[in-house]
Amino acid sequence: MIKVNFGKEILELDIPRTNLAFNIRANEFPVPKSELEEIRNSLLNPIGSKRLKDIVKPNQTVVILGDDRTRLTPQDRIIPIVLEELYSAGIKPNQIKIIIATGTHRPMTEHEIEAKYSRHLMNEVEIKNHNYKDFNKLVDKGTTRRGTRIIVNKEFLEADIRIGIGGILPHHPVGWSGGAKILLPGVAGDETTSDMHLLGATEQQLGKIETPCRQEMEDFASEVGLEFIVNVIMDSDGKVLKCISGHFIKAHREAVKWGFEVFGVKFNEYADITLSSTYPMDYDLSQGDKGLFSAELATKPGGEIILLSPCAEGIAPTHGDTMAWLAQFDDDKIWEMLKNKQIEDRFAAAESMYLNHIKKHFKATLMMDPISTSIMRFHYISKNDLRLYLDHRLKIDHNLKIGVIHQSTEVLPIFSK
């Protein structure tokens, strides 16, 4: 009996051992004796950089970028240790701001901020959401070498010292999260974020180290400045396994090595049907669809991917309407409409082409709201019908291979004979 999450609910599936291609999740890794000491030691031994306390001067202002509710990074446990380092250099709390790098996600509510950052931090330093559409709080700094406009949060740019804190996970289309990603798309403007995502719209990039999006992020960071990063690798319970700090490129590459150790999971047989459970990252389809790209790497061409992701907030709170409209068009038409400036939400265009890539190569089935599923032109299956469907497919094909990926938004399947 295979147990798999659909949100917090556990579904039990009877998949014969001879038909099970794989049943995988992120690799188990020893948890440090002290999570806080792991973080503290990382700050004491940064990679490619001086210690943070040796970078800042007592009269300087500091902005800390932290991720939002769609990421599991324990900001409430990391930031206090970073503050210790800043305070030891003579920085006062009123010289520090935390900007939540929401990218184009919706702003976090006060309750969500308290849950992720803690009431103590909220009382200690100023914490605010980035707003990618508030042009009064953005600055245009020209273009990158690829021509992407450098539009960035004004308060971030005006700070003397800028620190990014985030997590390391496989990510499409960037390859891996972490590093300069906290800056772009984290605190960039709408056009900048959209153009970056369009760079990786049509090719599978999950788990790659050098990608067009990653290069653009790092060019962007080189232009506007990102003095220090703190990146963590976590287990499925949100415990910090490894912390890497320092230069936004050199430290990030070291962190990615650890990411491969934890999230790179070997399998030896491709599946005809892959069940991809995204729990706990299943807020909306623009987050849950990461489980499609993970499953792509483990599914036979022309096979089926079934995404188990409730997506309680629908397609995407800030991009859903445009994504729903664009679902009727192929990539050529979307590129044509972009060229003719017929699409205002360019990020939604990138997301739509990501999904077109999956639909072109696989039968893609969603276990979420049936209306949204239909609008997005995916196949639909309910949680109550999944077992019957698998039984039916097994009766038709006794050699059918079924694979299961748990917490699929953080798994990088790696084929190994």
Language model: regions and residue ranges:
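Glycine-rich phosphate/diphosphate-binding loops that line cofactor/substrate pockets in enzymes
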Residues: 47-63, 88-94, 265-272, 299-300, ...
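An acidic, phosphate/nucleotide-engaging active-site surface
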Residues: 108-176
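Histidine-anchored nucleotide/phosphate-binding helix
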Residues: 71-91, 288-299
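Divalent-metal (Mg2+/Mn2+/Ca2+)-assisted nucleotide/phosphate chemistry catalytic cores
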Residues: 145-208, 217
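C-terminal non-catalytic interaction/assembly regions of soluble proteins
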Residues: 87, 289-417
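Membrane-embedded hairpin module used as a gating/binding unit in multi-pass transport
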Residues: 207-281
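N-terminal amphipathic/basic leader segments beginning at the initiator methionine
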Residues: 1-42
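Short glycine-rich or small-residue beta-strand-to-loop segments that form or flank ligand, phosphate
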Residues: 61-72, 97-103, 274-277
